[in-house]
């Protein structure tokens, strides 16, 4: 008999309470066991993946799938090596649990500790990438969270084998800590379980993430679009600006931290635009410009439309606009951006400061490519994704983003009555260096 989604979530809830109390050593050992098992059973994984890829290529020929989806779906020995290394890297990261975030004396013998703990049950829904299943499961385990995994049907064979490997490798952990759901209708059931699932992490297209956000009351960690900007100020080192704008678009155009709109101050447009246009042309980047940009470039590029300023291309396409001031650049980004990542290229530190303070984005850079917006590059280790929200976690989200906290109060028969009324004793409320010990 097939286990229902509700039963799987119930099992995950029970497991989450036990997993939160597993030792750091146990979680590390089980992650190493996952890495070893994937390595030992790589032929089985690749065989399953080949079935998914063959079916996907048929859908590609029929015009149902994109080449990008097929590419994301493919696994190889080299890709499995990277997955295995990622799991071992997660195992080696510092334990995010049981950390004393603050310690405060309320009164003599009455001490309050703020301590990091797992979130609980995390539901994740992702498209096309079987490596995402392993990454999310590994990060969930390291942070002491139970996880519900729902991958796309296009990767069903790969996901099923990888899940079985993970489940069997962690047989000594609380049963049900990781659950796989496969049917499309299970997603809607999952979205309605706000009393059982503590956090949802969708990974996929903008439309996909928007659907998740619009159809659940469970907190959602993620972003719908990556409409990132580079602004070239009139005080910029223009050679640096060309290198940054090129790297931000060309180095890996399909990811969410690639630049989509290039803003250029009008005072340097005549000098700068021909240089960056030539570099982009060498890489077959399609440019779409406003009237001022096209005038400088002799109208050799397509005219930008209003939709271009809000588009995440995920491809070798960039929109270019000439602006008359720093203020105009800031206004354009705040109006059209997705609050992901923005960069200013300038030698004027004051303008850089204004740009970084005035923008409402998760990551703001000075003289650096937007492609640095990444958990690994930030030193956070493997990441579960980028969050453009402002509650709980923001920007690249690593292990710490999968934890919350609880308050531990240590007293010695203290009563609230002592601190109330006319003769109330005052609180000391003094922070101190201390660690809560279970």
From Swiss-Prot:
It catalyses: L-glutamate 5-semialdehyde + phosphate + NADP(+) = L-glutamyl 5-phosphate + NADPH + H(+). Its main location: cytoplasm. One of its GO terms (molecular function) is NADP binding. Pfam families: Aldedh (PF00171). It comes from the Archaea. GO terms for cellular component: cytoplasm. PROSITE patterns: PROA (PS01223). Pathway: Amino-acid biosynthesis; L-proline biosynthesis; L-glutamate 5-semialdehyde from L-glutamate: step 2/2. It is found in: Cytoplasm. Its EC number is 1.2.1.41. GO terms for biological process: L-proline biosynthetic process. Keywords: Amino-acid biosynthesis, Cytoplasm, NADP, Oxidoreductase, Proline biosynthesis. Catalyzes the NADPH-dependent reduction of L-glutamate 5-phosphate into L-glutamate 5-semialdehyde and phosphate. The product spontaneously undergoes cyclization to form 1-pyrroline-5-carboxylate. Belongs to the gamma-glutamyl phosphate reductase family. This is Gamma-glutamyl phosphate reductase. It comes from Natronomonas pharaonis (strain ATCC 35678 / DSM 2160 / CIP 103997 / JCM 8858 / NBRC 14720 / NCIMB 2260 / Gabara). The gene is proA.
């Amino acid at each position: 008999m097939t286990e229902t989604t509700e039963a799987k979530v119930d099992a995950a809830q029970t497991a989450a309470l036990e997993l939160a109390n597993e030792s750091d050593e146990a979680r590390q050992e089980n992650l190493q066991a996952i890495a070893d098992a994937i390595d030992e059973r790589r032929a089985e994984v690749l065989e399953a993946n080949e079935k998914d890829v063959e079916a996907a290529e048929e859908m590609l020929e029929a015009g149902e799938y994109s080449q990008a989806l097929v590419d994301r779906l493919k696994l190889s020995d080299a890709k499995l090596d990277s997955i295995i290394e990622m799991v071992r890297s997660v195992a080696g990261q510092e334990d995010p649990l049981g950390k004393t975030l603050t310690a405060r004396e309320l009164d003599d013998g009455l001490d309050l500790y703020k301590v990091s703990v797992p979130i609980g049950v995390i539901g994740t829904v992702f498209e096309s990438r079987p490596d995402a299943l392993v990454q999310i499961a590994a990060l969930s385990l390291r942070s002491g969270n139970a996880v519900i995994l729902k991958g796309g049907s296009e990767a069903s064979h790969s996901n099923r084998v990888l899940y079985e490997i993970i489940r069997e490798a962690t047989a000594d952990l609380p049963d049900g800590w990781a659950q796989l759901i496969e049917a499309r209708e299970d997603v809607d059931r999952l979205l309605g379980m706000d009393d059982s699932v503590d956090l949802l992490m969708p990974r996929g297209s903008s439309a996909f993430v928007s659907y998740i956000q619009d159809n659940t009351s469970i907190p959602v960690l993620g972003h719908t679009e990556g409409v990132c900007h580079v602004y070239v100020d009139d005080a910029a080192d223009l050679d640096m600006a060309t290198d940054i704008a090129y790297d931000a678009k060309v180095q890996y155009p399909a990811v969410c931290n690639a630049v989509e709109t290039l803003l250029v101050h009008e005072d340097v447009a005549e000098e700068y635009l021909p240089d960056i246009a030539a570099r982009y042309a060498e890489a077959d980047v399609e440019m779409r410009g406003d009237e001022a940009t096209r005038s400088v470039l002799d109208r050799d590029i397509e005219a930008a439309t209003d939709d271009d300023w809000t588009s995440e291309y995920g491809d070798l396409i960039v929109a270019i606009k000439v602006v008359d001031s720093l203020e105009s650049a800031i206004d354009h980004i705040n109006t059209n951006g997705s609050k992901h990542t923005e960069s200013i290229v300038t030698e004027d530190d004051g303008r850089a400061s204004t740009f970084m303070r005035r923008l409402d984005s998760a990551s703001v850079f000075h003289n650096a490519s937007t492609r640095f917006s990444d958990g690994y590059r930030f030193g956070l280790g493997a990441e579960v994704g980028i969050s453009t929200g402002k509650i709980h976690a923001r920007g690249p989200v690593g292990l710490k983003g999968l934890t919350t906290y609880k308050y531990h109060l240590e007293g010695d028969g203290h009563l609230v009555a002592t601190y109330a009324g006319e003769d109330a004793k005052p609180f000391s409320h003094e922070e101190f260096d201390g660690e809560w010990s279970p």
